[in-house]
Amino acid sequence: MLTIARRILSFLFLITLLSCNSKKEQPVINDSGLNKNDPTSFISPENIPNPYAGVDISPMDMSYYPVDYPILKMTVSSTPSPVMRLIYSRPHLQGRTLFLDLLKYGQPWRLGANEATEIDFYSDVTIQEKIIPAGRYILYCIPQEKKWDIILNTNIDTWGLKTDSTKDFQHFSIPVSHNNPKLEYLTMVFEKSKKGADLIIAWSDVMTRLPIEFIP
């Protein structure tokens, strides 16, 4: 009887052991939905409530001249001070046409989205033979089919195009080109030129340049 009992106990133990080993380890999920056992998992941003500020659909961006100045400053100790900086938000087409779904010819445009687009000059520069003193300015435009009027305005720290035209500082007329490679997002960058740098403004298939000359 004792031998039979031992065999039964051994059989039950073996069954239990095999049952435990056959169970797959379940992934550990924390309260936030992140799989701790999967390093490639991520939390979908739209599922995370943000009590402080939501992510804007038109991201804010910054362009320097020299290009990538903050990186140069951190890697090259002898990097001189920047000449200028542009801060703007980048709207995108989302299946719409630039003209006339988003913009209208002859109507002012903030050259971005949300806060007014701002350009900062760290030293005096020249634009179309006009001296622009160092300082902060709002940058906006009035687009036409063949040319854009670019305006510098001193009414800084404002939203959208609530611009006080009495504070317009300078106006510049620059030609535009069409049928360029199409860009989904508004893009504004500085590009080196013979006498300084051009501010390139490009969106959809439209592109224009504002030539900026440096004063030695």
Where are these regions (language model features)?
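Bacterial N-terminal signal peptides that target proteins for export
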Residues: 1-9
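C-terminal motif of bacterial Sec signal peptides marking the signal peptidase cleavage site
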Residues: 16-19
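Bacterial signal peptide processing site
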Residues: 21-24
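Post-signal peptide N-terminal segment of mature Sec-exported envelope proteins
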Residues: 29-55
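Early exported N-terminus immediately downstream of N-terminal targeting peptides
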Residues: 63-101
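A mature extracytoplasmic/lumenal domain signature
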Residues: 88-92, 123-125, 131, 138-143, ...
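Mid-length scaffold segments of soluble, non-membrane domains
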Residues: 104-162
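Surface-exposed, gly/pro-biased binding rims or lids
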Residues: 157-198
